[in-house]
């Protein structure tokens, strides 16, 4: 299954979710590829300790802009490979908008189709905005998981990204489906409780039962350039992401 993990805005736990879902699947013995198309490259920086030494030719930039095969790197997590991102991806909207005759929305899909048989699951870490990179990710995917953190503006952004999903389904990828809404950074505050209540009232069965708690172990893991399972497999976040993978992939 190819799953895009997306959010309309930053700071929702999207990248943490991408890394954690990929790592949780790998821990279950599955062969996993994480494709980072977020120009901030945070997934890449966590999973590849030597990321800063990579040139753009060793990243997904060469596929999206150069129309060349994916450059796949092994990580220190057994069973988990990554296609890293690059800061220059932040300029892709201008370049891809000028290439419409080339069907720019399919650039990632074309190359993913060539390697998909080598993996049980492919996770795409999308940028925190609606762009040509998001369109490429959704066009290549079977499912989209939308990450939502507590807050009024976070809930408001769901409408936009849901509309994008429907537009991609209508125009580029008729098989695309919503995997569900994942509530992250949950805590005991009123804002968090109200946000979750509104999310469940509005989207009912489309909201995952699993809730991801706010957990300092996640930031500590990132500083150590480790996924949450390699850093603290007994943490609340690790337990939650393990439950999410079981729920989502029925493992």
Question: What are these regions, as identified by a protein language model?
Answer:
Residues 1-251:
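P-loop NTP-binding core
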């Amino acid at each position: 299954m190819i799953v895009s993990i997306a959010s309309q805005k930053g700071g929702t736990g999207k990248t943490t979710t991408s890394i954690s879902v990929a790592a949780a699947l790998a821990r279950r013995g599955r062969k996993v590829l994480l494709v980072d198309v977020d120009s901030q490259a945070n997934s890449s920086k966590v999973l590849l300790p030597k990321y800063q030494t990579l040139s753009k030719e060793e990243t997904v930039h060469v596929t999206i802009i150069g129309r060349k095969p994916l450059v796949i790197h092994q990580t220190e997590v057994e069973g988990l490979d990554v296609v890293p991102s690059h800061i220059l991806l932040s300029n892709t909207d201008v370049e891809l908008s000028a290439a419409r005759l080339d069907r720019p929305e399919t650039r990632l899909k074309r190359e993913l189709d060539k390697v998909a048989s080598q993996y049980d699951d492919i996770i795409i870490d999308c940028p925190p905005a609606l762009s040509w990179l998001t369109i490429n990710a959704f066009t290549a995917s079977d499912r989209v998981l939308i990450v939502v953190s507590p807050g009024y503006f976070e809930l408001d952004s769901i409408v936009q990204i849901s509309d994008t999903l429907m537009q991609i389904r209508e125009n580029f990828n008729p098989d695309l489906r919503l995997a569900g809404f994942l509530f992250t950074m949950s805590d005991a505050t009123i804002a968090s409780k109200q946000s979750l209540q509104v999310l469940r009232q509005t989207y009912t069965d489309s909201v995952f039962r699993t809730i991801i708690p706010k957990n300092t172990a996640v930031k500590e893991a990132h500083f150590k350039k480790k996924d949450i399972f390699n850093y603290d497999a007994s943490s609340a976040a690790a337990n939650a992401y393990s439950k999410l993978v079981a729920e989502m992939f029925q493992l």
